[in-house]
Swiss-Prot record:
This is Clusterin. Keywords: Chaperone, Cytoplasm, Cytoplasmic vesicle, Disulfide bond, Endoplasmic reticulum, Glycoprotein, Membrane, Microsome, Mitochondrion, Nucleus, Phosphoprotein, Secreted, Signal, Ubl conjugation. It is a peripheral membrane protein. Pfam families: Clusterin (PF01093). It is found in: Secreted; Nucleus; Cytoplasm; Mitochondrion membrane. One of its GO terms (cellular component) is spherical high-density lipoprotein particle. The modification Phosphoserine is found at residue 133. The keyword Cell wall biogenesis/degradation does not apply. Glycans are attached at residues 86, 103, 145, 290, 316, 353, 373.
Length: 446
């Protein structure tokens, strides 16, 4: 009789699950229940991620509106700058027609100006720019010998500097507009879809905890975008990877398009609050390029200053009037060029902000998409618990902790040590949270 009772007890024990080192092992049914609870948490995190995606999308749209406003200001400043530059060029041409006047006086002063200008410039270069003084000295000698005092007298260096600056500004603007237009075409197609406009975000159409047939409500099946992400009958179950991968690909493409040239713009904006004449880096660059930077130092040489003050009105009264007109238009052109630089710098910053937001969008969405990419079967669990061990069943697990092995979709197994008992109501929430954190961390490292 005792033997019979013992056998009955053993059978009952086996039906309730095997015992290991005094602890009852987790049954398959309990593992399924834990997987269901963990999957609900992952589903909630996916919904939160999509809500954040929409918030970032709103910020991108706001940044784009600010960019449009800046673009309008840039176009206005560009028009004024070009008008002033045209006036400057026209007046310069007229002045060149009378450059023979006072030529003897200017040439005498120029011969005394050149040695001082060369010495002053080379001292500056050796002290500030340092590299390649010998080559620069030879280049400067040729530049001064080929230049005329008339070029000096009409501030030809300032005119040339403006023209070069205008060329670079146009080049920079072309680069930024090309990058933005490439990204904008992708973002327009991405954001115009009702997936991003539905309120509130609802992931039930791909959730294993609800009907999947609601997916068709989010897309216009006639659009190219819808055809790309719905290569299957309209009312069939949606595949997680097919749903998300196109979004991730488009966001990634938009970010790449924006960053293609934006961070390699070959132009240094003038530093805010720093006078142009004290911008040593720009002066060094000009001196190395064609020696015109040396003409910035003309005020340090007496004979050079005298050339600038030569009055030829006795020979031709209209010449001094033209020179004054040139000076006025030159000042206006420099003023609008500086304004354009400031607006261009703000525009670039706005573009960088958009690029940064696209990066956030990419990072926020990528983990969802990458998880979806791992899904190769119809398993209804986002998170699947495969093993659970405590100290009683596995002596290597410290007392009071629980060792859990899980899989997110079809990902690699993730081993977690949880500072809670299985009986804790928050146990699976902690497991799911830790699993997602580990997955995101590994994704970033890869």
């Amino acid at each position: 009789m005792k033997t019979l009772l013992l056998l009955v007890g053993l059978l009952l024990t086996w039906e309730n699950g095997p015992w290991v080192l005094g602890d009852k092992a987790i049954s398959d049914k309990e593992l399924q229940e834990m997987s269901t609870e963990g999957s609900k948490y992952v589903n909630k995190e996916i919904k939160n991620a999509l809500k954040e995606v929409k918030q970032i999308k709103t910020l991108i749209e706001q940044s784009n509106e600010e960019r449009k406003s800046l673009l309008s200001s840039l176009e206005e400043a560009k028009k004024k700058k070009e008008d002033a530059l045209n006036d400057t060029r026209d007046t310069e041409t007229k002045l060149k027609g009378s450059q023979g006047l006072c030529n003897e006086t200017m040439m005498a002063l120029w011969e005394e100006c050149k040695p001082c200008l060369k010495q002053t410039c080379m001292k500056f270069y050796a002290r500030v720019c340092r590299s390649g003084s010998g080559l620069v000295g030879h280049q400067l000698e040729e530049f001064l010998n080929q230049s005329s005092p008339f070029y000096f007298w009409i501030n030809g260096d300032r005119i040339d500097s403006l023209m070069e600056n205008d060329r670079q500004q146009s080049h920079v603007m072309d680069i930024m507009e090309d990058s933005f237009n490439r990204a904008s075409n992708i973002m327009d197609e991405l954001f115009q879809d009702r997936f991003f406009n539905r309120e509130p975000f609802d992931t039930q159409f791909f959730s294993p905890f609800g009907s999947s047939h609601r997916g068709s409500l989010f897309f216009n099946p006639k659009s190219r975008f819808a055809r790309n992400i719905m290569p299957f009958p309209l009312f069939t179950d949606l595949n997680y990877h097919d749903m998300f991968q196109p979004f991730f690909d488009m966001i990634h493409q938009a970010q790449q398009a924006m960053d293609a040239h934006l961070h390699r713009i070959p132009y240094h904006f003038p530093e805010a609050g720093v006078p142009e004449n004290s911008n040593d880096r720009a002066v060094c660059k000009e001196i190395r390029h064609n020696s015109t930077g040396c003409l910035r130092m003309k005020d340090q040489c007496e004979k050079c200053r005298e050339i600038l003050s030569v009055d030829c009105s006795a020979s031709n009264s209209s010449q001094m009037q033209l020179r004054q007109e040139l000076y006025t238009s030159l000042q206006m052109a420099e003023k609008f060029s500086k304004l354009y630089d400031q607006l261009l710098q703000s525009y670039q910053q706005k573009m960088l902000n958009t690029s940064s937001l696209l990066k956030q969008l990419n990072e926020q969405f990528s983990w969802v998409s990458q998880l979806a990419n791992l899904t190769q079967n119809d398993d209804r669990y986002y998170l699947q618990v495969t093993t659970v061990n405590s100290h009683g069943s596995d002596p290597s697990v410290p007392s009071g902790l629980t060792k859990v092995v899980v899989k997110l979709f079809d990902s690699y197994p993730i081993t977690l040590i949880i500072p809670q008992e299985v009986s804790d109501p928050k146990f699976m929430e902690t497991v799911a949270e830790e699993a997602l954190q580990q997955y995101r961390q590994r994704s970033r490292e890869e």
